[in-house]
Amino acid sequence: MASNALSSFTAANPALSPKPLLPHGSASPSVSLGFSRKVGGGRAVVVAAATVDTNNMPMTGVVFQPFEEVKKADLAIPITSHASLARQRFADASEAVINEQINVEYNVSYVYHSMYAYFDRDNVAMKGLAKFFKESSEEERGHAEKFMEYQNQRGGRVKLHPIVSPISEFEHAEKGDALYAMELALSLEKLTNEKLLNVHKVASENNDPQLADFVESEFLGEQIEAIKKISDYITQLRMIGKGHGVWHFDQMLLN
């Protein structure tokens, strides 16, 4: 009955005659036919659908075989307890330069903390500058912690290096302590920027786009903003000299 219906339907519609699904001579998979009768607009239409059982057909054109790919040596999972499971495409040079940058950030933070302590003295009493350098110290320490977290994410090992003891006096007979400290801060920010660019360079040399992206997105833009802000402060301090204007500048930072 179904065969007669299909023959009648294709005879009346030669353009819809079924085409061979496989090239001549190929193994024939099992084909099942389904028919349905739809009524609409005063017409009855027989719809035929064919499905091919491909269970017995060879798979061709496979481009990704996960169970074979994971057997590659660089994807092997370490079995020793001291080895990182997360580490992948993370060069020793990248690990080392991150530890160096952690040390840079902590050293700069330490200098800023010394500046904060100086300007917070009762015989200096520049609360605005003290606030600015305390916030700067906390920011640099936060940068060090970001690098430590990233080191752990990539499977590296954080190694903290010694921190140099900073100076504690910032008096300067010619410039005054505010301008002298701010110029020192600008030098530190430019030095930090150079060190960050070196981290980015090492990442590029070792084909590590993830480390390069981390430095770009988290630090480089922020660093040039800090350089511009401190440069503006230096220009203002140079204009007002060592007199009463320094107090007004300090109040501006405080408020």
Swiss-Prot record:
Catalytic activity: 4 Fe(2+) + O2 + 4 H(+) = 4 Fe(3+) + 2 H2O
Keyword NADP: no
Any single GO BP term: intracellular iron ion homeostasis
One MF annotation (Gene Ontology) recorded for this entry: iron ion binding
Boundaries of every Ferritin-like diiron domain copy: 88-241
Induction statement: Up-regulated by iron overload treatment, and by H(2)O(2). Up-regulated by the phosphate starvation response transcription factor PHR1.
Binding sites annotated in the UniProt record for Fe cation 1: E105, E140, H143
Residues the entry annotates as binding Fe cation 2: E140, E189, Q223
EC number: 1.16.3.1
Keywords: Chloroplast, Iron, Iron storage, Metal-binding, Oxidoreductase, Plastid, Transit peptide
Stretch list, region Extension peptide (EP): 49-87
InterPro entries on file: Ferritin (IPR001519), Ferritin-like (IPR012347), Ferritin-like_diiron (IPR009040), Ferritin-like_SF (IPR009078), Ferritin_CS (IPR014034), Ferritin_DPS_dom (IPR008331)
Record's GO cellular component terms: chloroplast; chloroplast stroma; chloroplast thylakoid membrane; mitochondrion; plasma membrane; thylakoid
Subcellular location(s) per record: Plastid, Chloroplast
Transit peptide: 1-48
Keyword Aminoacyl-tRNA synthetase attached: no
Database matches in SUPFAM superfamilies: Ferritin-like
Role this protein plays: Stores iron in a soluble, non-toxic, readily available form. Important for iron homeostasis. Has ferroxidase activity. Iron is taken up in the ferrous form and deposited as ferric hydroxides after oxidation.
Family (UniProt): Belongs to the ferritin family.
Subunit structure and binding partners: Oligomer of 24 subunits. There are two types of subunits: L (light) chain and H (heavy) chain. The major chain can be light or heavy, depending on the species and tissue type. The functional molecule forms a roughly spherical shell with a diameter of 12 nm and contains a central cavity into which the insoluble mineral iron core is deposited.
Protein name: Ferritin-1, chloroplastic
Organism expressing this protein natively: Arabidopsis thaliana (Mouse-ear cress)
Organism placement in taxonomy: Eukaryota, Viridiplantae, Streptophyta, Embryophyta, Tracheophyta
